[in-house]
Amino acid sequence: MAAFLKMSVSVNFFRPFTRFLVPFTLHRKRNNLTILQRYMSSKIPAVTYPKNESTPPSEELELDKWKTTMKSSVQEECVSTISSSKDEDPLAATREFIEMWRLLGREVPEHITEEELKTLMECVSNTAKKKYLKYLYTKEKVKKARQIKKEMKAAAREEAKNIKLLETTEEDKQKNFLFLRLWDRNMDIAMGWKGAQAMQFGQPLVFDMAYENYMKRKELQNTVSQLLESEGWNRRNVDPFHIYFCNLKIDGALHRELVKRYQEKWDKLLLTSTEKSHVDLFPKDSIIYLTADSPNVMTTFRHDKVYVIGSFVDKSMQPGTSLAKAKRLNLATECLPLDKYLQWEIGNKNLTLDQMIRILLCLKNNGNWQEALQFVPKRKHTGFLEISQHSQEFINRLKKAKT
């Protein structure tokens, strides 16, 4: 018992001095400790063996780096082949460039036309080419989706037609019909006669096509869409204009887009398209250039004048372009009286080409501004201003004088 007490006393006596017996301890997970921290450590002293550095680290296969290296090498090879064959045949070099990008997994369309190839060749940088190819790829996907949807609808209609039992024949349907049916062919013939009469005796209306250098490709396509709508509204009107497409460059951007949209109907259109300017076709004193920037407000529609509309969709905000051109040619300019009749809210006073021709057709037929300005988009104004009694009397006098 006494020996045990002596042993416990000796252990208790040396316990505070254990940290001084082995001043430096080696811990694998605490190699970054300072000497003082190791000296003051209260853990039990321990000696560990150093890490065996003779074993080599596991080699990792970096697939991403390998892929990027291979892609860069293929891209360099693509650029070198294009630069070498550029002098020989640019079209073949562009096709090879597209094929290389397709092999690289880029977004490239499956089919590309000669016109799109020429547009791609006109791109200055590789970034512009990449953006244009991505646009064509997206456009092709949308077209395929629409085609699939169209085929599904056609199949559903055919199935419904086969299921449905027809109770009466086509002859019975015509007998039971109250009015005589007007076929599409008869309507086309009637509108064709009106168009032919307008080309001989109708009032000219000019669309100035001299703005294709001011527009980007998207704006140019939007312009052509508005021209198609304008021609359609004019063709269906009771008293159509004789439409002139002036300053239309043959094989220019606008001409190519118009031929692409109309296809074989382009040569059958009852309108006049020419490379000449409207100044060469009509006397200057009979021309009025309609532009929203003009300080002169249009009061009445003049049947003895030739109105000119600029075929210009301006998304990049270039105000005063058409006004400056009219001033250079010493032409009279006018703008629509939108502030006089409408409570204008927001936005500029530039209207689309189809809205302009519908307003002019309405003014040509009845001269009523309130009816004509209904074609102005409702989002731009809050309604019509109240017409004073003096203005109403003036309108009534004009109507009496006309009758």
Swiss-Prot record:
Name the InterPro entries on file. Answer: MT_TRM10-typ, MT_TRM10-typ_sf, Trm10_C_MTase_dom, tRNA_m1G_MeTrfase_euk, tRNA_MeTrfase_TRMD/TRM10
Entry's Gene Ontology molecular function annotations = identical protein binding; RNA binding; tRNA (adenine(9)-N1)-methyltransferase activity; tRNA (guanosine(9)-N1)-methyltransferase activity; tRNA binding
Note whether S-adenosyl-L-methionine occurs among the keywords. yes
What GO cellular-component annotations does this UniProt entry give? mitochondrial matrix; mitochondrial nucleoid; mitochondrial ribonuclease P complex; mitochondrion; nucleoplasm; nucleus; tRNA methyltransferase complex
Question: Where's the SAM-dependent MTase TRM10-type domain?
Answer: 191-383
Quote the PROSITE patterns the UniProt record gives.
SAM_MT_TRM10 (PS51675)
GO biological process terms held by the UniProt record: mitochondrial RNA 5'-end processing; mitochondrial tRNA 3'-end processing; mitochondrial tRNA 5'-end processing; mitochondrial tRNA methylation; mitochondrial tRNA processing; mRNA processing; positive regulation of mitochondrial translation
Could you list this entry's UniProt keywords, alphabetically sorted: Coiled coil, Disease variant, Methyltransferase, Mitochondrion, Mitochondrion nucleoid, Phosphoprotein, Primary mitochondrial disease, S-adenosyl-L-methionine, Transferase, Transit peptide, tRNA processing
Q: Which residues carry this modification: Phosphoserine?
A: 84
Localization of this protein? Mitochondrion matrix, Mitochondrion nucleoid
**Ranges in coiled-coil conformation:** 138-169
Q: Which EC class is the enzyme in?
A: transferase
Reaction(s) catalyzed by this protein?
adenosine(9) in tRNA + S-adenosyl-L-methionine = N(1)-methyladenosine(9) in tRNA + S-adenosyl-L-homocysteine + H(+); guanosine(9) in tRNA + S-adenosyl-L-methionine = N(1)-methylguanosine(9) in tRNA + S-adenosyl-L-homocysteine + H(+); an adenosine in mRNA + S-adenosyl-L-methionine = an N(1)-methyladenosine in mRNA + S-adenosyl-L-homocysteine + H(+)
Instruction: Give the enzyme's EC designation.
Output: 2.1.1.-, 2.1.1.218, 2.1.1.221
Q: Where is the transit peptide?
A: 1-39
Subunit info?
Component of mitochondrial ribonuclease P, a complex composed of TRMT10C/MRPP1, HSD17B10/MRPP2 and PRORP/MRPP3. Interacts with HSD17B10/MRPP2; forming the MRPP1-MRPP2 subcomplex of the mitochondrial ribonuclease P complex. Interacts with GRSF1.
Write down the disease named in this UniProt entry.
Combined oxidative phosphorylation deficiency 30: An autosomal recessive, severe mitochondrial disease characterized by lactic acidosis, hypotonia, feeding difficulties, deafness, and respiratory failure with fatal issue. Patient skeletal muscle cells show decreased activities of mitochondrial complexes I, III and IV.
- Which family does the UniProt entry place this protein in? Belongs to the class IV-like SAM-binding methyltransferase superfamily. TRM10 family.
Q: What does this protein do?
A: Mitochondrial tRNA N(1)-methyltransferase involved in mitochondrial tRNA maturation. Component of mitochondrial ribonuclease P, a complex composed of TRMT10C/MRPP1, HSD17B10/MRPP2 and PRORP/MRPP3, which cleaves tRNA molecules in their 5'-ends. Together with HSD17B10/MRPP2, forms a subcomplex of the mitochondrial ribonuclease P, named MRPP1-MRPP2 subcomplex, which displays functions that are independent of the ribonuclease P activity.
Q: What's the name of the protein? A: tRNA methyltransferase 10 homolog C
Query: Whose protein is this, by species?
Result: Homo sapiens (Human)
